[in-house]
Amino acid sequence: MKKRHLLIAGLACMTILGACNNDDAGSSGQAVVEVDGHEISDAEFVDMLKERYGEAILQELVQRHLISQAADSVEIPQEEIDEELETFKSQIGVETDDEMLDALSNQFGITVENKEEFVNEYILPPLVLEKLAVEGVEITDEEKQAYFDENRDSLIEVEASHILVEDEETAEEVLDRLEAGDDFAELASEYSVDPSAEANNGDLGFFGKGDMVPEFEEAAFNMEIDEVSEPVESTYGYHIILVTDRKDSYEELEEKIHDTLMRERSRTQEEVLRDLLAQADINVLDDQFEGLFDLPDAPPVEDTPEIDGEDASDEAEDQAEDADENAEEEDES
């Protein structure tokens, strides 16, 4: 989701901020580097950072403060926080908290004391924005039922596993072994050329229409539960498909419908931030950043010419007369 992009962007931005936030920067004139006898001071270094990246960093700091204030009115379940933390670890290729803290320091130049500090600074803000985005949005049972009735066919989901092989001969060999009673998951691990098969034994989980290549989708959505397909050819090779479950009732799809309607009706995170900025009292004290937080004025509403009842009648009569005259001219011609 977008919040994950926001998290990575925030880390990158705060990497720059770390250089600007040095306790001695800009005050002592201490040299950062010496080149052929010429010293480049930390003041020069920070001034250039401010010139080039100052607006982005200042916006980030203000936004983080506003989100922190707004967090007081938002309740986020611990399981959501834990899920986001695990997702972030996966994104940067680590498993433990210590590995994550090391990666933050080595990859992003971010030093935090512990996991809790990282969660408060980087995991919570996107979650707060997400909660604010759906604030006040309500979906009724009647609306969900109506959406289901109108979009039933496109909402259906199928759960399936597959064994992908390169040629039809191998596919027939796999089918023979399945008919002989061999286990589908074990055969997927043995035969499938799908890179994910080693980890998931061919299990694709639930998917909807449009998620798979057309040939695969056509076969899977027309199969019964526990049915095994004949070889299905696609651009990837030959698939042996096993359908294991299906969601096609309102009760099974209600959560998906609810999430879809929430996404359609909620504000974007950009809109949430814009609203927070509009409500805040921001006084820019540095001339370099004057106007940075000014919000664009709403476009003026164009006045619609008013026609009172009498004028409207006159105009209608004129149009009718013009139409009659045109008709008479056509008859004469």
UniProtKB/Swiss-Prot annotation:
<comment type="similarity">
    <text>Belongs to the PrsA family.</text>
</comment>
<protein>
    <recommendedName>
        <fullName>Foldase protein PrsA</fullName>
        <ecNumber>5.2.1.8</ecNumber>
    </recommendedName>
</protein>
<keyword id="KW-0413">Isomerase</keyword>
<dbReference type="InterPro" id="IPR050245">
    <property type="entry name" value="PrsA_foldase"/>
</dbReference>
<feature type="lipid moiety-binding region" description="N-palmitoyl cysteine">
    <location>
        <position position="20"/>
    </location>
</feature>
<dbReference type="Pfam" id="PF13616">
    <property type="entry name" value="Rotamase_3"/>
</dbReference>
<feature type="region of interest" description="Disordered">
    <location>
        <begin position="291"/>
        <end position="333"/>
    </location>
</feature>
<keyword id="KW-0564">Palmitate</keyword>
<feature type="lipid moiety-binding region" description="S-diacylglycerol cysteine">
    <location>
        <position position="20"/>
    </location>
</feature>
<keyword id="KW-1003">Cell membrane</keyword>
<dbReference type="InterPro" id="IPR000297">
    <property type="entry name" value="PPIase_PpiC"/>
</dbReference>
<dbReference type="GO" id="GO:0006457">
    <property type="term" value="P:protein folding"/>
</dbReference>
<dbReference type="InterPro" id="IPR046357">
    <property type="entry name" value="PPIase_dom_sf"/>
</dbReference>
<dbReference type="InterPro" id="IPR027304">
    <property type="entry name" value="Trigger_fact/SurA_dom_sf"/>
</dbReference>
<feature type="signal peptide">
    <location>
        <begin position="1"/>
        <end position="19"/>
    </location>
</feature>
<keyword id="KW-0697">Rotamase</keyword>
<dbReference type="GO" id="GO:0005886">
    <property type="term" value="C:plasma membrane"/>
</dbReference>
<dbReference type="GO" id="GO:0003755">
    <property type="term" value="F:peptidyl-prolyl cis-trans isomerase activity"/>
</dbReference>
<keyword id="KW-0732">Signal</keyword>
<comment type="function">
    <text>Plays a major role in protein secretion by helping the post-translocational extracellular folding of several secreted proteins.</text>
</comment>
<feature type="domain" description="PpiC">
    <location>
        <begin position="155"/>
        <end position="245"/>
    </location>
</feature>
<feature type="compositionally biased region" description="Acidic residues">
    <location>
        <begin position="303"/>
        <end position="333"/>
    </location>
</feature>
<dbReference type="InterPro" id="IPR023059">
    <property type="entry name" value="Foldase_PrsA"/>
</dbReference>
<keyword id="KW-0472">Membrane</keyword>
<keyword id="KW-0449">Lipoprotein</keyword>
